[in-house]
Amino acid sequence: MFLSLPMLTVLIPLVSLAGLFYSASVEDDFPQGCTSTTSLCFYSLLLPITIPVYVFFHLWTWMGIKLFRHN
């Protein structure tokens, strides 16, 4: 399988971080201008937090199913 789970766990945060650096280089008022939801900068700050948290809880749920299925 080309996109395995360990590869995605590393690849998704790196892509999110690249998006964060891209918006930091494009936006003139990067830290202060990120408060509006219409700004691209807002979502580039939201993605690096949302995606790893989603992956963590997805893996946590999967581990819970794997552990408690055997009892």
From Swiss-Prot:
Its main location: endoplasmic reticulum. InterPro entries: PIG-Y. It is found in: Endoplasmic reticulum membrane. It comes from the Eukaryota. Keywords: Endoplasmic reticulum, GPI-anchor biosynthesis, Membrane, Transmembrane, Transmembrane helix. The chain crosses the membrane at residues 4-26, 45-65. It holds the Pfam family PIG-Y. It is a multi-pass membrane protein. Residues 1-3, 66-71 are cytoplasmic. One of its GO terms (biological process) is GPI anchor biosynthetic process. Coiled coil: none annotated. Component of the glycosylphosphatidylinositol-N-acetylglucosaminyltransferase (GPI-GnT) complex composed at least by PIGA, PIGC, PIGH, PIGP, PIGQ, PIGY and DPM2. Interacts directly with PIGA; this interaction regulates glycosylphosphatidylinositol-N-acetylglucosaminyltransferase activity. Does not interact with Ras proteins. PREY is derived from the same bicistronic transcript that encodes these 2 different proteins. Part of the glycosylphosphatidylinositol-N-acetylglucosaminyltransferase (GPI-GnT) complex that catalyzes the transfer of N-acetylglucosamine from UDP-N-acetylglucosamine to phosphatidylinositol and participates in the first step of GPI biosynthesis. May act by regulating the catalytic subunit PIGA. This is Phosphatidylinositol N-acetylglucosaminyltransferase subunit Y.
